[in-house]
Curated annotation (Swiss-Prot):
Any one GO BP annotation for this protein: valine transport
Extracellular side of membrane: 66-73, 150-157, 211-230, 288-312, 383-386
Record's protein name: Large neutral amino acids transporter small subunit 2
Recorded name of the encoding gene: SLC7A8
Superkingdom to which the source organism belongs: Eukaryota
Primary subcellular site in the record, as a coarse category: membrane
Amino acid sequence: MEKGARHRHNTDKNHAGGSESEDFPEASSGGGGVALKKEIGLVSACGIIVGNIIGSGIFVSPKGVLENAGSVGLAVIVWIVTGLITAVGALCYAELGVTIPKSGGDYSYVKDIFGGLAGFLRLWIAVLVIYPTNQAVIALTFSNYVLQPLFPTCFPPDSGLRLLAAICLLLLTWVNCSSVRWATRVQDIFTAGKLLALALIIIMGVVQICKGEYFWLEPKNAFDNFQEPDIGLIALAFLQGSFAYGGWNFLNYVTEELVDPYKNLPRAIFISIPLVTFVYVFANVAYITAMSPQELLASNAVAVTFGEKLLGVMAWIMPISVALSTFGGVNGSLFTSSRLFFAGAREGHLPSVLAMIHVKRCTPIPALLFTCLSTLLMLVTSDMYTLINYVGFINYLFYGVTVAGQIVLRWKKPDIPRPIKINLLFPIIYLLFWAFLLIFSLWSEPVVCGIGLAIMLTGVPVYFLGVYWQHKPKCFNDFIELLTLVSQKMCVVVYPEVDGGSGTEGTREDMEEQQQPICQPSPGKDKDSLEQSQP
């Protein structure tokens, strides 16, 4: 990792707003350098948020939300409240995104506010749990919706589900490695299937209501509990719902590429989050018009069961549409995770080979292969709902830490420019909700939450050995350099270059900056004084 930082800074002298080589455009500039361009306008920004939120969650999580909520009415309330809380969290991230205008999202914010260790733990848990788990769940959902029509009287075989999910991951990894343009076109095509599936579900729900089929939506029936209310289970219902809203913060990963981020970042949030909340709530209402709670809980593919009850001979449309949606979701997640891992490697927090791109295709092949391998390993986990709980708990943990960092930054640095400045009541509301989820989730599922925390804490020794400890044995450095060289030759990749950076004079200074928080105890202590204190 140390060498990765050295190679990175040889070619990349960062300005205060972040690196100019953090992404991988489809072609290099004439001088051999790679630079980010501000090409994401308002429409594209909304597409990033909506496209990343609407994945497999709305087709998988309705079962988990209803099961833990205990009644139809409370389940609908969970979907509405989760959407509102998501909007509050997105507003907090909007302020952070323009105050710390770096790509990398909450990883960059946590690193700059709390220091290198905290940022590394965020990246570490994303590498080990969040992205592999998310991609595994979406891939398993894809395979379930493809195979379910072939097994109308029983569940598809587990081995078949996992094999098809693995094939899906390998195929899309190849597409993303081959061309950024190909990956973008795949995303556009399969987003159409995603929107078609949800529009069809909502329209059929409206038709059902017009026909008087709304028994479970009547107040006396909607709040008829089929199990004893439990505050811990309600917290788990919110975690299941939060999985469906996952991806609302992905626009912050590409802040440096936004056209006029001070305007378009909050505008995209104001448009996208209410739109997704509307779609999610009415999709769940549509499910209830066609299925009883017992039927919904018994279904392993909610949207397929919905289509079978309402579409008759055209029921095949639903599994195909949902499969298209989840296939595109895997593609988008692979693309996003490669950007995050690339950014982490650029900061010296991941092996330097992950910061390399193909010499002609300009795709981050090592980062894509790494995330594909980690997702394939995650497929051995037997219960996808346990995977969702892992993702939800750890995500809320770091969402809360990031929003807490917003309050810390207000206190420590009250005078720094803030083009967007929200009322402090918003982060406080979000933190209270976050605390409620974590406390009661830990109470209800101590083993699941404990495993998530244990995985996160494994990053502490890795950080001190891999990042903080700079004077490693020469034999270790030579071995890592050999592995990096072999990987370069196998993948035909190089470090991206930009004009204006040469030599190694900034290496120690920038590595020291990684380990220091933005909020220093002594305001006058800057990078120069830190560098002078080095032996």
